[in-house]
Regions:
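Solvent-exposed loop and edge beta-strand segments that line ligand/cofactor-binding
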Residues: 33-50, 88-107, 148-184, 221-250, ...
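Low-complexity, Ser/Thr/Pro/Gly-enriched N-terminal "stalk/linker" regions
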Residues: 1-51, 55-91, 130-134, 144-148, ...
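Well-ordered alpha-helical scaffold segments within catalytic/enzyme domains
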Residues: 2-3, 50-65, 106-124, 174, ...
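A surface-exposed beta-strand-loop module
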Residues: 448-479
């Protein structure tokens, strides 16, 4: 079973509209070639540039729109690198700066994605491959041996951080960040570079040294006391995505087991009532869409590798109530308050903290929204299809999402009212061999409540009705209290209120009117995922009650 490739997916409908808004935002002035290399990045060299390159590359593929400035940004990158081929300072005496490593991890991710996107252009792809090799060789390999010394004692990690982290002090050879644990974000960028270099670069010595560094990082990542030192959840989850990429390469069961362990820790100790995140473990001060997107991607990837229903359910809930609820009217992504957190004021309310984290989260939205389209359908292998009564060319519907998909050589269009309503249409657009295509619908507690089923067709369309049921649930996580949350299917419904909490509505008194639900006295409950349709002023002023005692 595998996710579809990016070039097999074309977003349509609302997810395409959201992606287009973000695309326009990321082609604005501060993300253009004349500006991007000179903006203030608060000590994160390579971060702004890398996240932007990654976002534009992913959005180009998911929307089918050619990016206006992406190629020029990549072409001009070398003008802003030092003589060793990476950005900003060259440290001496074996010193390492964890924010420099973290920022360059995003630069590696962006360049790896761009290489694959432009791999049929030999001039561009070879230049980028050379840049990837230089960054690995001249920056990251200098960190070999240092991860054993990474400061992980509570008394060493006492920095207070803001929504953009900063370098605090030096301990040993490490310049440490208020974003505790960000030295492990490179598990993501370096694992991507390792897989790419193994396939496309004939440099065995470099890849062996890189593998040794990755092994060192993984070994010490296993030892981090995440709660004791309040590790940043974005750093934690990004590192776990890198660890999972390595698992996909070497199939080491210890890696998969550890990712599942840490993801459970995150759900229990680092997740808000609306499936967003605490920026750090143990510090429910604000959310960060970077981490929310990480958690969505991890949930879907863990479902792919384990097929455990829990991960499918979390994929839905994080997507609709965490990722999509964090997008802003301008297409970017911003931070919110931590709903449900024990001991915090107004824990029942979802409210804006920072309207837009334009320096990081808006760019992370590019891979996030592209992954929403890509992860919706899972293509089964021939062997997996044979194990299920021989249904041919099976594609599993993890969640229905508007788009045009190429699966098993068949071009398929999906039209979905879900999750607002239950009607989903699957239409075959092109099927050159007239082969049967099989749709598999897994059982979902508040989606497809029927038994799992297979539907095969060669042409025409299949219409599926998915249950979208009103119900109450207790907030997930160990720190979100016992309050009740109102759901329609997997979407959280909220009520715009002042600071004063309202009473829980009578479920029998709620009726759906279009995209909202109302009580007989006119009280409105709307999906929090639709916040991006509001005005910027409303986003910053409104408080939305989502928890009821």
């Amino acid at each position: 079973m595998r996710f579809l490739s990016y070039d097999s997916v074309l977003a349509r409908g609302e997810i395409a509209a959201r992606a287009s808004l973000l695309y326009a935002r990321l082609e604005g002035t501060m993300y253009r070639p004349d500006t991007i290399f000179t903006v203030e990045t608060a000590g994160w060299p390579g971060d702004w540039e890398g996240r932007t390159i990654l976002a534009l590359t992913m959005l180009a593929q998911s929307t089918g729109k050619e990016p206006a400035y992406l190629d020029e940004i990549v072409e001009r990158l070398g003008d802003y690198c030092n003589e060793k081929g990476y950005m900003r300072q060259i440290l001496s005496d074996g010193d390492v700066d964890e924010q420099q490593l973290s920022g360059h991890s995003w630069l590696l991710r962006g360049l790896c994605a761009y290489f694959l996107f432009r791999r049929n252009d030999p001039v561009r792809s070879e230049t980028v491959l050379g840049r990837i090799r230089e960054i690995v060789q001249n920056l990251f390999l200098n960190a070999a041996g240092r991860y054993a010394e990474y400061p992980i004692l509570p008394e060493e990690r006492v920095e207070d951080g803001k929504e953009s982290g900063h370098i605090g002090r030096k301990i040993g050879h490490w310049y440490i960040s208020s974003d505790t644990g960000c030295a492990y974000i490179p598990l993501d960028g370096l694992s991507h570079a390792y897989v790419l270099l193994k396939e496309y670069a004939a440099d065995r010595e470099l890849t062996e040294k890189l593998k040794a560094l990755l092994d060192e990082m993984v070994m010490h990542f296993y030892t981090i006391p995440f709660l004791d030192i309040k590790v940043q959840t974005h750093a934690t989850l990004t590192a776990c995505r890198g660890l999972l990429r390595l698992y996909e390469y070497d199939r080491d069961p210890k890696k998969l087991a550890f990712v599942q362990k840490i993801f459970k820790l995150y759900v229990d100790e680092g997740m808000t009532a609306n499936y967003a995140n605490y920026n750090w473990f143990g510090r429910p001060e604000w959310t960060e869409p970077c981490a929310i997107i990480d958690s969505f991607m991890l949930a879907a990837q863990l479902y792919l590798h384990t097929h455990k229903p829990l991960y499918a359910e979390l994929t839905h809930k994080i997507l609709y109530n965490g990722v999509l609820a964090s997008q802003r009217p301008n297409g970017g992504f911003g931070t919110d308050t931590c709903t449900g957190a024990d001991g915090t004021a107004a824990a029942e309310f979802l409210a804006c903290s920072c309207y837009e984290a334009y320096w990081c989260c808006s760019m992370r939205g590019g891979e996030g929204l592209a992954s929403v389209s890509r992860y919706s359908l899972l293509e089964w292998s021939a062997e997996e299809s044979r194990r299920t009564d021989g249904y041919p060319n099976t594609v599993e519907v993890l969640y229905p999402m508007d788009g045009i998909y190429t699966v098993h050589g068949v071009k398929l269009m999906v039209r979905a009212d879900y999750p607002m309503e239950g009607k989903v249409t699957f239409r075959i657009l092109e099927n050159p061999g007239n082969k049967p295509l099989t749709l598999y619908f897994p059982k979902m507690q508040y989606g497809n409540k029927q038994e799992p089923c297979f539907v095969s067709f060669c042409s025409g369309e299949v219409v599926r009705d998915v249950d979208v049921e009103l119900h109450l649930e207790t907030a997930a996580g160990k720190n979100n209290g016992s309050g009740k949350i109102l759901y329609a299917g997997y979407q959280i419904l909220g009520h715009i209120a002042d600071d004063k909490s309202t009473d829980l509505p009578d479920m029998n008194d709620l009726q759906q009117y279009g995209k909202v639900w109302k009580t007989s006295d006119g009280t409105v409950f709307a999906p929090i995922s639709a916040r991006y349709l509001d005005t910027p002023e409303a986003i910053q002023q409104k408080k939305i009650q989502i928890l009821w005692k």
